[in-house]
Amino acid sequence: MSRIKIVCTSTGCLDYAPEQYEEIKKKIDIIRIHMFFQGKEYLEGVGFDPADFYRIMENVKDVKGNLPHTGMPTHEEVAEVFERWIAAGYDKIIVIALSSYLGGTWNFIRLVAKEYQSKAEIVVVDAKITCFQEGQLALMAQEMVDRGCDVPEILQEIEWRKAHQEFLGVDERLDYLILNGRLKGGKAFMGKAMNICPVVHFNHQGELTSLFSAIGPNNALKKAAAQLVQWIGARKKEDYILYRTFTGKSLVERQQALEPKFEIVTNHPDVIMSCVTGINVGPWIVGYAYVPIRRPDEELPPVPSYYYEQTGKIAE
């Protein structure tokens, strides 16, 4: 009988997942992203609480001179994960990796996985998103492994969720978006001059884009809330997961204060965003993660083509 191991990149926030996931997350291994800040190197999720990290970022006087950055895991780190679980008797491995639009990590892990094709069936999934929604894909995959599901069925469920989940966030300040090159030229200048706050969103191709903008954070929060309500539509509360997510908490109280007006009711604990995400967008972003739960009447997509491409299997 096959043994399937689930792995997730550290950006999936499993290290700081809510208590309800305490037992199941222990079954999932983590490939860690490197972080460089104030002359020191860290592995994400090891020895650095994200809340403390964001407090430090908020108080940095010279942001440009102290700009943190990230680095991919090394070949040795990724190979060690594969070798360890293959040696432990696992013949199938699913890796959930942060969106390929956010850097080369997904592709790098996929290339390392190719070196082990003769030893195990390894599939590296592009989550097309990051933070805890990425981690939730890994948690769902682990739940399915525990129920005895095989890799193709797990990937079908993952692809359905990827196609339906949504994230949107309001960034109170543009400093990190500008310095990291995500906001450039005239848009950057006018944005700072006019106190424009972008409402950012992961499209279903996995790209972090500006969905729309507003003058001032309150107007941006209102636009974000209205968009969220539109996405949810008439879907019943038991058919989705909804929670707040943030880097720093500067806007969380204002976010909560608007919720009654828009009849927004979260049904899951808040989850802090990964430090790697904060490095790119800054410590002043708040948002919502909306995760539909597939109903029996909602059809699964076919087994994704990347399953056959990465494993060498032939589609039936």
Task: Mark where each language-model region is.
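Class I S-adenosyl-L-methionine
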Residues: 40-95, 100, 107, 114-115
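Mixed-charge interfacial surface used for oligomerization/domain docking
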Residues: 3-5, 10-40, 83, 92, ...
